[in-house]
Amino acid sequence: MPTPASISAWNSRRNFPRESDAAGVAPQILQGGYTGTKWERDYGISSGSCNREEIGALVGGVIGGAVGARTASEENRTVAVIIGAAVGALVGSRIGRELDEADRGCFGHALEIGTAGRAVRWNNAATGVTYVVVPGSGEKLDGKSCRNFTLTAVRGARTEKRAGTACQTAIGTWAIRP
């Protein structure tokens, strides 16, 4: 897994698009995250969906499961991402393996800025899987901000639903607790 220093160096080389007006003024902060991070964009999360295409464009340069992302803070992040091999096991063998970087971005960002008890949905057209994450309550575990969730994956007549807890890592990604 990359170190925070390598992620920071990678982030500084990335040229993420910023929304701004003609004068180059930075956009207004739209959403405060569960962990206190201020996010420029919510990618549809607050309305119960996830703009998978936009998130996919941002997380295309994933390094070891950690992405560059842009927040209003100096951490320079754009999107929260869920990481770890446990993601595949959580959802189920076949469907879990099909979670790609954009799906992980939607999952992590739903944990970060989603409202407790409110479903966030998106569809991966390439795999035919529709995902629904319902962020739950949160707590501090081992000094980390953690959040319970349920994740449902639907493909055709097959539905898998799992519950779990994810905690934010030192570099701002979310990792599922074993």
PLM feature spans:
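Classical secretory targeting signals
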Residues: M1-T3, G60, A166
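Extended interaction-bearing regions that mediate binding to partners or small molecules
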Residues: A5-I7, N11, F16-Y34, Y43, ...
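Short, low-complexity, glycine-enriched hydrophobic/amphipathic alpha-helices that associate
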Residues: R41-I113
